[in-house]
């Protein structure tokens, strides 16, 4: 799935036991789909997985330092995937597949209590018309959607998983609640009953 994200190849680097070079990807989505396929090959029918890690994007404005590599931005991302039945098997509940709105609810819960907006978008990993940019406070913080049919076919998946990827930094941004002092006077409640003529409107 590296083809859908501008992968950056590391010179003279390979995985243990593999001759192929390591690529620094700009998204975690591909690795989640790889894990899904492994689980399906072991007969798992309901899969929920997540990953936290750095992605790599070319950015000429980034300079060399003790924590950065010149020309590359390395933000931390949180990505997750849901596949299969929406709910665990139980009596009296009909089975249905997880969908866009189930994962949308997960994203809203993850970012609560902030208000989250979902804006229709296009992304090479996701199904056209079933993809959205995730916004908090008017700024893009991630993307979510159903896996593109092209990738579903390439990975030979019986059905499409739903995924999201968020900027990890937004998860640590918390609005500090404001407090007010307790009122000196207690509130008072009174029940009133009024008797009026029927002709009164």
Language-model regions: role of each:
Residues 1, 11-201:
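Extended beta-strand-rich architecture
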